Amino acid sequence: MTQIFRIALLGLALALPLLASGVEPEADRWNLKDLYPSQPGWDKDAGTLEQELKDLSGCAGRLAQSPARFKRCLDLNAEVLKRFYRLYGYASQSRDEDTSLPSGQNLKQRADVLGTRLEEATSFLRPEILGLGRSKVNALLKANKSAAIYAHWLDDILRSASHTLDRRGEELIASFGAATSAAEAVYSTLADAEMPWPKVRLSDGTEVVVDQTAYEKYRALGNRSDRKIVFDAFWSKWREFERTFGVTLYEQLKKDAALAKIRRYPDSLAQALDANRLPQAVYDTLLTQAELHLPTLHRYFKLRARMLGLSEMRYYDIYPPMVSSNLKYPIGLSTELMLASVKPLGEDYVRAMAQGTKSGWMDVYPRPRKRSGAYMNGSAYDVHPYLLLNHNDDYESLTTLAHEWGHAMHSYLSIRSQPFINAEYPTFTAEIASTTNELLLLDHMLKIAQDDSERMIYLDSALENLRGTFFRQAMFAAFERDIHARVDKGESLTGEALTKIYGDILKRYHGDTQGVVKIDEIYTIEWAFIPHFYNRFYVFQYATSITAGAMFASEILNEKPLARERYLNILRAGGSRYPYELVKAAGVDLATAAPYQAIVARMNSIMDQIEVIQAKGK
């Protein structure tokens, strides 16, 4: 699968589970007819793609015959990619509407096959462009000014010369793409479909099957004994499959190490970062700063323990809210609040978002067999973004709405500003758009809060967001760096070994030996629960994104000159520039300590506000 397509669908593949129950009216469903009126339309377009792939093969060995032919071949490649993204979006979203229907599964499988054929058909492009060399490519661009839209795309290929194989080698890698995805497929099948989930009885007599959805719901119960029962049952079941999940993750790590070696990178991390020309200083600085500021995370845990009335904080005390809330946020109200919160981004932004919310872009409510989680798919260039939600009328659902619409507006602005080949953006900037909108929402909610009790709800949520998005993702990134480095060096890893490595990091981040949060050994299997580890070095970008988003949101809200325009220019730029340089040019250098120090200062400031409110009540 092409790099640009991986980027387009990462959010889809990595959606985190939310609650799934209830039924929604038809008006709250997305309109896939904007993609294709019916499956026959999809079938026809799939046939067109097959023919275009054959036509594209005619470009092999002939790219440089003339400037005009060079441009035509690049245009055909772009058209092939654009058509495939639309086909794949319809197939995957049809499957997600009801994951039990064979028709949806079949369509998704057909789209996967098309993806493999596309990989094979386009595999000649990179080695042939590299064979031309930079001077020849520049001459072709100069001779045909209309080809300038491909300048960045071509530069991204040319800079990878030392890491690209010859045509036959690239064809082999493309052909083996599907075969080497078995680790993730096995993991997903077991974790999502075949795990024999345990059943527990809660203190009120309720019997619960503790699957992933139930775990995420019941881990936040107010009754501490119930939380422990849920935790123990859930993680004990994962522990039973420690060896199996150890095999699947180790196979994934071996695949990543092999690809890095084949492409002549020193290690897996170097290859992952080079995909978007990210300096390793970004990764290293994030982890250094996260570890340096663990006392702030520990301060949060101590505050949480005090507010929950606990003499000892345990891992199953992480999730219950510090402040209870009965406030409801149905989708209509949530949409109004979201639209009000983004007013600092300007009238055009608000108007476009408002139109999208009532134009069939969203599938809003949970229902049986609908895919859990939330994602935005903005890969259908000629249509519009789509959002899958599982809205439960709570504050978390409101923040998820703001998050996913941040992604959607990023796609909307990018598509309006860039040609197709430059419209898709990397994860490094994608999550900035979503987290910035979350932070704007928080600011708005704090401003309209009726009293300190309501304000505490939002401050509590903000703290948990910082824990989960900055510190927790940095912790995952530390684990990834460790296990990849071991396999890159030729070490073998078992499930037991992975549990030990993860457990040590988990305990360090939570201050286990310092008595901050006690981590029971049974919970150190948590690594097996995280699907992100099958997409190498992805999660660190959540932490860098909330860091950058906090700075952008602060500057925009404080009406710093040009702050809004610099931020919107990141969204409009799409994938037309390398992301680190793009964000740096807007004023945030994520390879330096300052942005991370600012996000930690923000977390401390929120805790200060909570303690001031607490002091009032004494």
Segments the model singles out, each with a brief description of its role:
Residues 7-17:
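Bacterial N-terminal signal peptides
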Residues 264, 392-412, 434, 439, ...:
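Active-site recognition of the HExxH zinc-binding catalytic motif
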Residues 411-435:
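Post-HEXXH active-site segment of zinc metalloproteases
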Residues 327-329, 382-401:
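Short pre-active-site segment immediately N-terminal to the catalytic Zn-binding motif
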Residues 23-24, 33-37, 41, 125, ...:
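C-terminal, non-catalytic "cap/extension" segments appended to globular domains
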Residues 21-324, 335, 506, 613-616:
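A well-structured
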Residues 310-341, 410, 463-469, 474, ...:
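Long, K/E/R/D-enriched contiguous segments that form extended
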Residues 327-329, 362-384:
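Catalytic zinc-binding patch centered on the HExxH motif and its immediate surroundings
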